[in-house]
C-alpha cells in the first residue's frame, strides 16, 4: 500500500512538472493593479489565511522601475508588461523614444489567436490601454477608445462608455463597433448571454464602481470572455485587470483593499479551475507596481485581523510577485524585469 501511495504521488508530481514545462495554447494574464505582497497577504489573512493564488507553485518577483522613474506609474508599468519595453511614466504602448511598440495582444491577434481584455475599470484606463493603444499621454482617453477600432480584438469588457459616444470629435464609436459586427452589451447579464462572435461590453458610463457595488462583474465577465475566446481553435490571449486594488491602496483603505483583493482572487480561482480542467492554458498573475507601501506591524491570524500601516498614498518602487500555473509556468520563477514577461509569453505561444 505504501509503495502504491508513493508511486501515485510520484506520478502526480511528474505530471505537474511536465505540465509546467510544456507549451500553452492559451494565456490568461491577470494583473492586480497596485497589488504587492502586502495587499495579497491582507486578503489572505482576512480570508481564513488562504487564497486561490496559493494554487500556483511557480512564484517569482518582478522589478517595476520605468525608463524615467524609480517608481513607475500604471502607464509605463502596463506598457512594460504588454509591450516588453521600459518607457517613460505616463506613456502608453510606446517606447521611451515615443515609437509605437506592438503589444502581446496585438501579436497574438496577428497570429490568428483570439484576444480579449476584461477590466474592473474603464477600458481606456492605463493598464488595459497598454495592450491596445499607442499614445504618449495616458489621459488621452478618447484617442485610446479610438484605438480599439483599429484592432480586431474579439472581446473587451469594462467601463468607460462615455469615451466611445460623448466625444469632442462627435464620432459615435459604439455605432462604429456595431458596423464592425461587435455585439455591444451594457450589463453583465447581457455579457454572460453572448456565447460567440465579437463582444464590446461597456458596462459603465465612466469608471466601474468599487466592491461590493460592482458585484461579480470581474469573475463573471472573465469567464464569459473565456467562453467566447475558446471558440478559436488556435488559442487565445486574455488580459484581466483587478484595477481597484490600486485605488483602495491610494486611499490607504485597508478594508477596501481586502474587498478588491478577494474579488480579484475569486477571478483567479475561476481561471485556474478552467486551466486545470483543460490543461493547455498558462495563467500568469502579477502586478504593474505596488501602491501605498502597506505593512502590518501586528495582527491575529485566527481572528483574521491585522493592523495596517501605509507609508504613502502613491506608488512604491518595490518588486511585486508573479505567480504562474499551467504549461510554461516554470519560466516565471526568480527575479525578472517587468518587460521580460511579454517576451516569455511570446516565446511560449510561438508568436
Regions found by a protein language model. Name each.
Residues 21-160, 164-167, 173-191, 197, ...:
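N-terminal catalytic scaffold of extracellular/periplasmic and nuclease hydrolases
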Residues 37, 262-301:
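Metal-dependent active-site segment of extracytoplasmic phospho-/sulfohydrolases and closely related
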Residues 84-88, 198-211, 246-251, 323-327:
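Gly-rich Lys/Arg/Thr-decorated short loops/hinges at beta-loop-alpha junctions or inter-strand turns
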Residues 95, 185-222:
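Functional beta-strand-loop-alpha-helix junction segments that form "active/interaction loops"
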Residues 256-272, 303-316:
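Gly/Ser/Thr-rich active-site loops/lids in small-molecule metabolic enzymes
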